[in-house]
UniProtKB/Swiss-Prot annotation:
Further remark: Present with 32100 molecules/cell in log phase SD medium.
Phosphohistidine modified-residue sites: H232
Protein's pathway: Cofactor biosynthesis; NAD(+) biosynthesis; nicotinate D-ribonucleotide from nicotinate: step 1/1
Organism: Saccharomyces cerevisiae (strain ATCC 204508 / S288c)
Enzyme Commission number(s): 6.3.4.21
Post-translational modifications reported in the UniProt record: Transiently phosphorylated on a His residue during the reaction cycle. Phosphorylation strongly increases the affinity for substrates and increases the rate of nicotinate D-ribonucleotide production. Dephosphorylation regenerates the low-affinity form of the enzyme, leading to product release.
Single biological process term from Gene Ontology: subtelomeric heterochromatin formation
NCBIfam families with a match to the protein in the record: NAPRTase
Catalytic activity, reaction form: nicotinate + 5-phospho-alpha-D-ribose 1-diphosphate + ATP + H2O = nicotinate beta-D-ribonucleotide + ADP + phosphate + diphosphate
Superkingdom of the organism of origin: Eukaryota
Protein name: Nicotinate phosphoribosyltransferase
UniProt KW Cell membrane keyword: no
Entry keyword set: Cytoplasm, Ligase, Nucleus, Phosphoprotein, Pyridine nucleotide biosynthesis, Transferase
InterPro entries xrefs: N/Namide_PRibTrfase, NAPRTase_N, Nic_PRibTrfase, Nic_PRibTrfase-Fam, Nicotinate_pribotase-like_C
């Protein structure tokens, strides 16, 4: 038997907790199915990885929120509704992987011993929403434990420290966003150590530039803020329940603000059904409540110009009063480039850097060759029996039933766009 990797329900992204609270409050009886997709489908699995994953998935059923963890959540996310806190504090609150996860594998034709994974998660939305992050991080860890083993941890801490120092030297405010595609739990811990070492090298300057980490467990361990926006899942789910795509963004924002209060709205995610459609609804009171927006697909520089135009020319807001958080496949160089674009367009900039921190490795046998991360996602497939879809700002990130995607694009007058950064199979190479 293997040792459990995930030892706490806090080993997840903060936005899963806020979305969990919003689902519990607004949609307690909604049922969902999530589907796993490997966008880097050339990267396959072996039997050892599959058997290890089956064990690790089953261990998730042993986890409970501890009293100390509940106190931490109340302290760090004080706007979580008290009824939600009571719900997750109950000794009965747990995951039921044996009932909720369907996990099979299929041998690839002509490639014996090479398997693709088929994973579905089904149940009520409030009972299954916390699976996504632990499942993804475990799948990545399995791949690099049993399939691609031509790598080691050498210089990972130093590499993270150097990246953080470069970001700090350029005045860049960022969070670590790398849980879901980390090479391993140990890798993420080393990265956090490296980032904190860089912070402590010049604390007067750097403490305010490190916004925190999306991982609640590591935020708690390293004494930084847990950071969270919202995921596409929330907007996809709200849209799918009503099938009202014309008002989906507005309805999702209404539910969010009603749950947490306008002052805790945070950052708005604009691209679920294309940013152009989002901006039709993004006017007062929403544009006042949200401190800014998150960029997660399409051309970031074009996006910056579009958002700047909306805030400054359409809404007549003063320059440098709103934030763009860039979070799409970032590295240090891209962050520096986009920070200049934001400044030129009168926007404050923050950055969520994930895979480039927690899964940036080289082959041990050929150090000049990158050891490629998996590009894996777990997305809503169905909500209350209706298709759930995501369109985003570039073709490579369309998700869900093709006929529904086509119909909604027509309904919203969606304009197709692709850009040079749109290669989902080799996203970080």
């Amino acid at each position: 038997m293997s040792e459990p990797v995930i030892k706490s329900l806090l080993d997840t992204d903060m936005y899963k907790i806020t979305m969990h609270a919003a689902v519990f409050t607004n949609f307690p009886d909604v049922t969902v199915t999530y589907k796993y997709t490997n966008r880097s489908s050339q990267l396959t699995f072996n039997k050892e990885a599959i058997n290890w994953l089956k064990e690790q998935f089953s261990y998730l059923g042993n986890l409970r929120f501890t009293e100390e963890e509940i106190e931490y959540l109340k302290q760090e996310i004080p706007y979580l509704p008290s009824a939600y806190i009571k719900y997750i504090s109950s000794s009965n609150y747990k995951l039921h992987p044996e009932e909720q996860i369907s996990f099979t594998s299929e041998e690839i034709e002509g490639k014996p011993t090479h398997y693709k994974l088929k994973i579905l998660v089904s149940g009520s939305w409030k009972d299954t929403i916390l699976y996504e992050i632990p499942l993804l991080s475990l799948i990545s860890e399995a791949y690099f434990k049993f399939v691609d083993i031509d790598w080691d941890y050498e210089n990972q801490l130093e590499q993270a420290e150097k990246k953080a120092e470069t970001l700090f030297d350029n005045g860049i405010r960022f969070s670590e966003f790398g849980t879901r595609r980390r090479r391993s739990l140990k890798a993420q811990d080393l990265i956090m150590q490296g980032i904190m070492k860089a912070v402590n090298g010049n604390p007067d300057r750097n403490k305010s530039l490190l916004l925190g980490t999306s991982n609640i467990l590591f935020a708690k361990k390293y004494g930084v803020k847990p950071i969270g926006t919202v995921a596409h899942e929330w907007v996809m789910g709200v849209a799918s329940i009503s099938e009202d795509y014309l008002h989906a963004n507005k309805n999702a924002m209404d539910c969010w603000i009603n749950t947490f209060g306008a002052k805790n709205a945070g950052l708005a995610l604009t691209d679920t059904f294309g940013t152009d459609d989002f901006l039709k609804s993004f006017r007062p009171p929403y544009s006042d409540a949200y401190v800014g927006v998150r960029q997660d697909s399409g051309d970031p520089v074009e996006y910056t110009k579009k958002i700047s135009h909306h805030y400054h020319d359409v809404l007549k807001l003063p320059k440098f009063s709103k934030i763009i958080c860039y979070s799409d496949s970032l590295n240090v160089e891209k962050a520096i480039t986009y920070s200049h674009a934001a400044k030129e367009n009168g926007m404050l900039a923050t950055f969520g850097i994930g895979t480039n921190f927690t899964n940036d490795f080289r082959k041990k046998s050929e150090p000049q060759v990158k050891s490629e991360p998996l590009n894996i996602v777990i997305k809503l497939l169905e909500v209350n029996g209706n298709h759930a879809i995501k369109i985003s700002d570039n073709l490579g990130k369309n998700m869900g039933d093709p006929a529904t995607v086509k119909r909604v694009k027509e309904e919203l007058g969606y304009t197709e766009r692709s850009w040079s950064g749109d290669n989902e199979a080799h996203r970080w190479t």
